[in-house]
Amino acid sequence: FGSLLGICLMTQIITGLLLAMHYTADTTLAFTSVAHMCRNVQFGWLIRNLHANGASFFFICIYLHIGRGLYYGSYLYKETWNIGVILLLTLMATAFVGYVLPWGQMSFWGATVITNLFSAIPYIGQTLVEWAWGGFSVDNPTLTRFFALHFLLHFIIAGLTFIHLTLLHETGSNNPLGISSNCDKIPFHPYFSTKDALGFILLLFPLMTLAMFSPNLLGDPENFTPANPLVTPPHIKPEWYFLFAYAILRSIPNKLGGVLALAASVLILLLIPLLHTSKQRTMTFRPLSQFLFWTLVMNLLILTWIGS
């Protein structure tokens, strides 16, 4: 899945760059500029749909990648794992600020709700939020800085990916038995190149299918309405890939407690390497650990379902 994440990143950067050329980061024009892009720019609709749904595929790949890392004990490469967690956090930040850019209803209210969570931090919270907003509500300054951040964060992700790969290169990759791969080393081309090419096709085919046939399947219909600070949508919810965290946030009646639980749900990944006590690296021959792992997976799926 690592190679698929690489192709996702490249696709997102290319489509995003083309979109940025036609986008206007201004509250009065953002929504219209996106509409103009889809109507009047050559293949603009396709580029936009690929970029929007590409994010979904990016998250599918990264969740599978993390799941596989947990299953096969890859987190014992501590440096690689920790950079990976930082990559996940950066990706989540990027997806969040990117979702605000079309300036629809859900963009605006999603931004309002999530940035507001910073106000739960004692003492400095309120100041922090107003500083992030650039005013007393989500407005033009917020949109312009979110566009700048969205543009910047992709290159940060690309840089971190390079570090991630360099650290992995120090040790070599893991395998399902958790033993040394030295005796199994084979030439990259034609073996791995073919395997990767197949992966790319299996990734890009469903992405193209989704972008062509039902591009709005995963989006929120509220986002077809331009942002209106005076009308709150009946159900404020993020894109599907954040629903598990959002469900955790909403299920705790205390604001600070919810924020901490939300942060912990992702940051717990940093503790995983410290919690490994087995003599075996992978879960291949550990049925009890397997049971717990699949329970975790089901938990995440149920939380995602509840969150919607």
Curated annotation (Swiss-Prot):
Protein's recorded name: Cytochrome b
Cell location: Mitochondrion inner membrane
Gene Ontology biological process terms in this record: mitochondrial electron transport, ubiquinol to cytochrome c
Binding residues for a ubiquinone: H169
Membrane topology: Multi-pass membrane protein
Function: Component of the ubiquinol-cytochrome c reductase complex (complex III or cytochrome b-c1 complex) that is part of the mitochondrial respiratory chain. The b-c1 complex mediates electron transfer from ubiquinol to cytochrome c. Contributes to the generation of a proton gradient across the mitochondrial membrane that is then used for ATP synthesis.
Residues noted as binding heme b b562 in the record, renumbered to the chain: H51, H150
Record-level Gene Ontology MF annotations: metal ion binding; ubiquinol-cytochrome-c reductase activity
Gene that specifies this protein: MT-CYB
